[in-house]
Regions:
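Hydrophobic alpha-helical transmembrane segments
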Residues: 7-12, 35, 39, 50-54, ...
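Hydrophobic transmembrane alpha-helices of multi-pass small-molecule transporters
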Residues: 35-38, 57, 61, 80, ...
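Interfacial aromatic-anchored transmembrane helix boundaries in multi-pass membrane proteins
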Residues: 18-33, 55-91, 95-96
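Membrane-embedded alpha-helical hairpins and interfacial helices in multi-pass inner-membrane proteins
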Residues: 26, 66-74, 89-188
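Short, flexible micro-motifs
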Residues: 44, 48, 52, 56, ...
Length: 188
């Protein structure tokens, strides 16, 4: 992908993440951002997906009504790149070639993506809760225990979003006029 196109994709997808974060700001830990970052990594590679994740948190984490904390901003920015890297890694492993858009494969792919979304979110929540404990000077175990309800909500909602959203988003990206995926996904 050409550098101008890469920058455009990063800008547009980052804007989509930030916009959906603000749209869902009243719903704690329920966001489309992780799904968008993962699909961006899957569709455009780990570098693009990770850049979208980090930039989203740099914008959203700085201009956030919940306040600003540098250690937590660092952890969320770093943590969000995990989704982009995972999507890019699965792309390199050929997952795009195995992702079907036929009705018979949607359920199977949805379950796989839900499991991936749940696992990535568990890692993200662990990292960010550890950063919260550190930045607040609190013992780690009580912070992790107190975070369980929020983490479960985040993990389950992401599993649902990944189950329902990965294949349709990839399908939409495939339809873009100059999408690199058009060539890669012709056989799908």
């Amino acid at each position: 992908m050409k550098s101008t196109r890469r920058i455009s994709v990063i800008a547009v997808m980052t804007a989509a993440c930030v916009a959906t974060n603000y749209a869902l700001i009243g719903f704690t830990n329920v966001k489309f951002m992780d799904l968008i970052v993962f699909v961006s990594g899957l569709a455009f590679g780990a570098t693009v997906g990770s850049s979208i994740g980090a930039l989203t948190w740099l914008v959203y984490g700085t201009l956030n009504p919940y306040g600003f904390s540098l250690p937590i901003l660092f952890a969320t920015s770093l943590g969000e790149t995990i989704y982009g890297m995972a999507g890019g890694s699965l792309r390199k492993l050929g997952l795009l070639n195995n992702t079907g858009f036929a009705k018979s494969q949607i359920l199977t792919d949805g379950v796989k993506f839900a499991a991936i979304g749940f696992l990535l979110t568990f890692i993200y929540d662990l990292l960010t809760n550890m950063a919260s404990a550190y930045s607040l000077g609190l013992p780690l175990v009580p912070v992790l225990i107190a975070g369980i309800p929020f983490a479960l909500l985040h993990e389950v909602s992401n599993a649902c979003f990944f189950f329902l959203g990965v294949t349709p988003l990839l399908s939409l990206i495939k339809k873009l006029p100059e999408s690199d995926l058009r060539q890669e996904m012709k056989s799908i």
